[in-house]
Every structure is written in C-alpha cells, then in structure tokens.
Curated annotation (Swiss-Prot):
The chain crosses the membrane at residues 362-384, 391-413. Pathway: Lipid metabolism; sphingolipid metabolism. The gene is nSMase. GO terms for molecular function: metal ion binding; neutral sphingomyelin phosphodiesterase activity; sphingomyelin phosphodiesterase activity. It is a multi-pass membrane protein. The active site is at residue 264. It comes from Drosophila melanogaster. It catalyses: a sphingomyelin + H2O = phosphocholine + an N-acylsphing-4-enine + H(+). Residues 318-330 have a biased composition (Polar residues). Keywords: Hydrolase, Lipid metabolism, Magnesium, Membrane, Metal-binding, Sphingolipid metabolism, Transmembrane, Transmembrane helix. The keyword Membrane applies. The record marks 177 as: Important for substrate recognition. This is Putative neutral sphingomyelinase. One of its GO terms (biological process) is sphingolipid catabolic process. The lineage of its organism: Eukaryota, Metazoa, Ecdysozoa, Arthropoda, Hexapoda.
Length: 442
C-alpha cells in the first residue's frame, strides 16, 4: 500500500555575504525555481544572511508554507528547511569539533555547524529530515580538517539513530563535503545503515565543468567535478522506501543570465513509501531502489533497512548477488559488519594521529609563548630611542597579544579540541567493540 510520495531537494546556495558572486540575483532565481511546486521538502545550506533566509521563506511560502532556520554560532548554522507539510518539531545538535576560530578565512567555526532535524508530518506518517553541512576541505593534499569531518560524520549517524524513533522515513540531505571514496562518507553511511540515493559515476555536484563558478584550477584538478552533495535514505520499521528517481533538476544557467544558480548543483530524489506486513522470520524494513540511469536503463536493488540486523546467512547470500551499478544503487549495499569495521578502524587511526598532533601543537605553542615572554622582558628593560617610543610600545602590545594567543591555544583550545576528538574516538570504540556481538541493535 502506497503511504506517500515525496520529492526531496538539497542545495548549497553559496550565500556568503560580500563574498559570493551574484548572490542576490541567484537567490531570486532559486526562489523562483523552488516556488514552481516541483518539490515537497527542500534542504538548503550556506544560507548565511538573515535577509536571504527571509527572502527564501517568503518567496516560496505559496507552495512551501512551512519552514525552519537553524540558528547557531556567530553567523547561524546556515541550514534552512522548506516544506510543503507541517513541521511538528525541530532539534539542532552542534558538533564537538568544527574547525578553528583563528582560521577566519575558513569561517566554519563561526557558523557553529551541526545537524538539524525537522519532524515533518506527511500524510499521517512522520518523516525525519536531517540537514547537515560538514566542514569544508580546503586543501586535499594537506587536509587538516579530515578528522573533524570524520567525527562530524559519525556524530551525525549517531544523532540519526538516537532520534529516529518510530518515524516512517529518515532522510539526510545536505552538503557533506565527502566523496564516496572518502572515509567520512563511509563512516556516515556504514554506521547509520542509510542508503545513498545515487551511485552513478555520471553525476557530479560541485566543481562541475559546466558551472560558471568553477575555477580553472578546479577544472584542471577534477575535470569531471566531484559529488559531495547527497541525499541518504533509511526506512522505518514495516516500511519499504522506493527511490523512484534521482537527478540534478536545475538548469546549467539561471534563465536569461550567464551565471549558474550556485557553485554547487541541486540534487533531487523522488521517494515512494509503501507499507509492509511485518514478518517475524525476515527483516521487515527495507530500502528498494528502482530508478532510471542516464542512458535510460533501469535497475532494482533491495537493501536491508533501518532496524534490521544482518545475520551471517544474510551476509553469505548477499555475496552471490551480482554487483549492480546504477543511478539508485548505493555503496551502502556493502555496509556489512566487515565494511563498517574497516571504516571505523581507519577513523580511529585518524583520531589517534590527531591526538598526537594536538600534543605536539601544545608543546610548540607553549615554547613559542616562553620565547616571546623572554623577548617581552627584554623589550621592557630596553630603553627606546628618541622618536621610537610609540613604535616600541605598540611592539610590546603585539608581543603580549601573541603570548596570550599562544597560551590560549596551548591550554584552553587544545583541551577543547582534544576532548572533542577523544569523545568521538571513544564512541567509535564502543560501537566497534559491541557491534558484531549485538548486531541486531546496530
């Protein structure tokens, strides 16, 4: 029996005030597209300006009358949800690690990033929509935020598990800054047992060649672009969720203009929910995929869903299934205990490396503070030449300020980040230790 049908859309709108190009005309164009009535639930990221949030809500209220913006940090979390159906409850969970406050040019810390939950009532069924925007990757060769994203991914998976309750469907839609081969993607998908609505190499959502905002360097680095914007799905008990369609629905350019809607591509998934009769001897919650790929062919995949354990017999039978690559299939088809264990072990190794680096950083900051303190004492004892007193006084204030910064980074900030990483590491160890023995509960 068909319970409901939903069109879910996610888009990073690139709405950074004074930085993002063509921001106002792009927001207007996005409003017009969302007001077309094609989408039932919309998950937006990087809505950093209050005026943009209000414009998006007001411009779409005729077809998406229910909305919620998640406030957090200095600038707001940048997360906005628009819905055709009533939003009965909301909850925001801030991540324990989220970049560095002194990296002003990156600004992730100021957003107070986390995962936002909207409990939406659709046709008598409770749907949980999770909106998230993981920490950005600024340097692929030297990614100092990799551990932060891994912990954010694991934290998000645990948040989804802890809050899913008796919801018929859980949807995570957002900019996860993680490609399918990345460890943060694997940790999130394998530990949450969600399904990626896309598994086709033909889709890219960022740094795309046709996007007007893709730089020449990005095109040279990734000629085809990357896929970091995702819609993950997980069915509730006694529910079969069919992913009927996956596509990038927006045109390449804003109509009548030479620029794109955003530096990211919008992603849409069409979902159908069916009620299943529970069976005591078989798993009951499933995810079924039956959707079109780019060349027009179809594929069908059934995935064990939210509340089900994978027994050894299930695992063995799955090994005889042919590998299917299609628009709606997912690497989470392989999210068996072995794959989850491998992902967690890799994540734990990253956490250990980060903890060692934090210890080294603490020593370096204290050493720098000690050296600068000696320099400050010498400056105090030194008599400034005539005409140089103002400069010397300013120099003393600068040195004193740097000393305070080094002491803060070596003590308060170092312990804050250490505890954040340590908490994530301990939580992963708990799952790794108990998951295989108590697989039913994971």
């Amino acid at each position: 029996m068909l319970l409901l049908e939903l069109n879910i859309l996610t888009l990073n709108i690139w709405g950074i005030p004074y930085v993002s190009s063509d921001r106002r005309p792009r927001i207007d164009a996005i409003c017009k597209e969302l007001a077309s009535g094609k989408y039932d639930i919309v998950s937006l990221q990087e809505v950093w300006a209050q005026e943009d949030s209000e414009l998006l809500q007001k411009g779409t209220e005729a077809v998406l009358p229910h909305s919620h913006y998640f406030h957090s940090g200095v600038m707001g979390a940048g997360l906005l949800v628009l819905s055709k159906y009533p939003i009965l409850g909301t909850l925001f969970h801030a991540w324990s690690v989220n970049g560095y406050f002194h990296r002003i040019q990156h600004a992730d810390w100021f957003g107070g990033k986390g995962v936002g939950l909207c409990r939406i009532l659709v046709g008598g069924q409770m749907v949980h929509l999770y909106n998230a925007h993981l920490h950005a990757e600024y340097d692929n060769a030297n990614d100092e935020y990799k551990t932060h994203r891994v912990i954010q991914a694991f934290d998000t998976a645990q948040f989804i598990e802890a809050t899913r309750g008796n919801s018929a469907l859980q949807i995570l839609a957002g900019d996860l800054n993680a490609q399918p081969q990345d460890i943060s993607y694997k940790v999130l998908l394998y530990t949450s047992k969600m399904l990626d609505s896309c598994d086709s190499d033909s889709f890219r959502t960022n740094e795309c060649e046709h996007n007007s905002y893709t730089s020449k360097q990005a095109r040279e680095r990734n000629p085809l672009g990357i896929r970091i914007d995702h819609i993950f799905v997980r069915g509730g008990d006694h529910v079969n969720a069919e992913i009927a369609e996956y596509k990038l629905p927006f045109p390449e350019r804003v109509p009548g203009e030479k620029f794109s809607f955003s530096d990211h591509e919008a992603v849409m998934a069409k979902l159908k929910l069916f009620k299943l009769e529970p069976r005591s001897e078989e798993p009951v919650a499933t995810i079924e995929v039956n959707c079109l790929v780019e060349d027009g062919e179809t594929c069908s995949v059934r995935e064990v869903g939210a509340g089900d354990a994978l027994t050894g017999e299930d695992d063995q039978s799955s090994q005889h299934q042919p590998e299917i690559q299609c628009n709606g299939s997912s690497t989470s088809i392989q999210s068996m205990p072995a794959a989850r264990t491998a992902a967690l072990l890799e994540a734990l190794a990253l956490c250990d490396a980060s903890l060692l680096q934090l210890n080294t950083d603490r020593i370096l900051y204290y050493s720098a503070a000690t050296f600068l303190f000696v320099l400050l004492v010498l400056l105090v004892e030194f008599t400034a030449p005539v005409g140089m007193r103002t400069i010397f006084l300013l120099l003393k204030f600068i040195v004193f300020g740097v000393i305070l910064f080094c002491v803060f980074m070596a003590s308060i900030w170092n312990y804050m980040e250490r505890n954040g990483v340590l908490q994530g590491k301990k939580s992963m160890e708990v799952m790794l230790h108990h998951a295989q023995k108590y697989e039913y509960f994971y």
